[in-house]
Regions:
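Conserved P-loop NTPase architecture
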Residues: 1-16, 119, 136, 155, ...
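Conserved G1/Walker A P-loop phosphate-binding module
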Residues: 2-82, 97, 101
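Residue-level signature of catalytic and energy-coupling elements of molecular machines
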Residues: 38-39, 57, 73, 90, ...
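Helical mechanochemical/support elements of P-loop NTPase systems and associated helical scaffolds
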Residues: 53, 70, 82, 86-89, ...
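Conserved nucleotide-binding/hydrolysis micro-motifs of P-loop NTPases
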Residues: 54, 76-77, 108-112, 135-139, ...
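Conserved C-terminal guanine-recognition region of P-loop GTPase G domains, centered on the G4
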Residues: 65-66, 89-159
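Canonical P-loop GTPase G-domain recognition
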Residues: 136-190
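Extended helical scaffolds that flank P-loop GTPase cores
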Residues: 155-157, 179-230
Length: 230
């Protein structure tokens, strides 16, 4: 099943997303987390949804119904290491376009798999909101998610959401507004031993998101974080 320009706005194959003076909000996430459902709910467009990996190959953009923003639905991917076309498209957009904020959609029924991508994006920009989608499915499975505790650990807003029913979407928009106006200052970034980062630097295989500049924390460990994003 393909995507059409009439159903999803403008695709990357036509020169990227449509140029606009509006703030740009990127929607990122693994395949099958309901990211396109979030996009549809916020824009009123009809991006095709499905339960197969790699469905969204190109960028799809649309104007938010309730806020003066341009939303960009990035291809579903599991990391920002460009091992696939989807990962390369998502990585390049976040790195080069520098959206005003990023909403990272996670699967409430499988947080551990979704969090890896979220942590990579937090290393690029602090203007991140974590949208834990499919919370209704998680409740059916008896899964409880402590959003407040997760927010404290990550240092960025965390919103519980069910895009199909509309639960949490207003809270998601409010959280995005907050991070654009006041970017979080104490976001969680993975810290690596100095020996690891020195080896990666010398081998030329620094993972995306890691700074080439040596930064140490109070314990003398190397900090990994992309420092160029303002």
């Amino acid at each position: 099943m393909g995507l059409t320009n009439s159903s999803v706005g403008r695709s990357a194959s036509q020169g990227g997303f449509e140029a606009t003076n509006l703030p740009v909000i990127a929607l990122a996430g693994n395949p099958n987390v309901g990211k396109s459902t979030v996009f549809n709910a916020l824009t009123g467009l009809k991006q095709h949804t499905g339960n197969w990996a790699g469905k969204t190959i190109e960028l799809c953009s649309g104007k938010c119904k309730k806020e003066p923003w341009q939303l960009v639905d990035l291809p579903g991917c599991y990391s920002l290491s460009p091992r696939s076309r989807e990962e390369a498209v998502a990585r390049d957009f976040l790195k080069e376009r520098k959206p005003n904020a990023a909403a990272v959609v996670l699967d409430a029924t499988c947080l551990e798999r979704s969090l890896a991508l979220a942590l990579q994006i937090i290393e690029i920009t602090e203007k991140v909101v974590i949208c834990i989608n499919l919370i209704d499915e998680a409740r059916k499975c008896g899964i409880h998610i402590d959003a407040e505790r997760l927010e404290m650990r990550l240092g960025v807003p965390v919103v519980l959401c069910s895009a199909r029913s509309g639960e949490g979407l207003c809270e998601l928009l409010e959280a995005v507004k907050r991070v654009m106006a006041n970017p979080p200052e104490n976001v969680y970034r993975i810290q690596y031993p100095k020996s690891v980062t020195e080896y990666l630097q010398n081998s030329g295989r620094m993972p995306f998101g890691c700074s080439n500049k040596s930064d140490k924390n109070e314990d003398g460990e190397q900090e990994c974080g992309f420092k160029e994003h303002s």
